[in-house]
């Protein structure tokens, strides 16, 4: 006679099948460099070239937002030299990072990397908004709600690498 399978075991197996194990290498103790390695591997498996190839990397933790620099209380990081094709440079505000879940960290990291590497801008600036969008792409905000799920991140990340979201914009890096 077969032993009955507990519902919790079945639910856990289904959950494990649904969640991409690719992200299991990241946890609350992972470094910015480990997040970068994941980002690079994710870009490559999404069909993009190595986003760091031939570039100087400068990833670091900053302190509380410097409001004079353009970083505001609803921004968890800042990209630098976005028009410099020889670098990828951005900071993550340490106090935000320490309070974030792994999923929030993924969103923030990919958001800042999107500015620094792909020259992505926010789809809208606050002054341009008349209503909230139907979905919030990675480039929408660098801070997402605490209850954001890995599944939501994976969908948004796929759109991120395909450059497929409403309001996609880029920094203008042409020389005058």
Which residues make up each language-model segment?
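Acidic helix-start/capping segments at beta-turn-to-alpha-helix junctions
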Residues: 53-69
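Short pre-active-site segment immediately N-terminal to the catalytic Zn-binding motif
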Residues: 91-109
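Bacterial Sec-dependent N-terminal signal peptides
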Residues: 1-12
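Active-site-proximal beta-strand/loop segments in catalytic clefts of secreted hydrolases
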Residues: 60-65, 94-95, 112, 140-144
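Residue-level detector of short, conserved catalytic/binding motifs and their immediate flanks
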Residues: 57, 105-106, 137
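Metalloprotease/metallohydrolase-associated module, dominated by Zn2+-dependent proteases
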Residues: 12, 16, 20-39, 48-52, ...
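Active-site recognition of the HExxH zinc-binding catalytic motif
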Residues: 106-120
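Post-signal/leader-peptide non-cytosolic segments of secretory proteins
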Residues: 60-62, 103, 116
């Amino acid at each position: 006679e077969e032993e009955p399978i507990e519902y919790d075991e079945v639910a856990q197996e289904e959950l494990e099948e649904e969640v991409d194990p690719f992200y299991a290498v990241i946890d609350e103790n992972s470094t910015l460099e480990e997040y970068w390695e994941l980002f690079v591997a994710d870009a490559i498996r999404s069909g993009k070239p190595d986003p760091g190839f031939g570039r100087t990397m400068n990833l670091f933790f900053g302190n509380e937002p410097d409001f004079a620099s353009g970083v505001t209380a609803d921004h968890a990081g800042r990209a630098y030299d976005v028009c410099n094709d020889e670098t990828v440079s951005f900071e993550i505000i340490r106090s935000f990072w320490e309070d974030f879940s792994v999923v929030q960290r993924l969103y923030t990291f990919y958001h800042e990397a999107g500015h620094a590497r792909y020259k992505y801008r926010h789809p809208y600036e606050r002054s341009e908004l008349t209503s909230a969008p139907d979905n919030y792409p990675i480039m929408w905000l660098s801070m997402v709600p605490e209850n954001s799920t890995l599944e939501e991140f994976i969908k948004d990340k796929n759109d991120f690498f395909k450059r497929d979201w409403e309001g996609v914009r880029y920094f203008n890096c042409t020389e005058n």
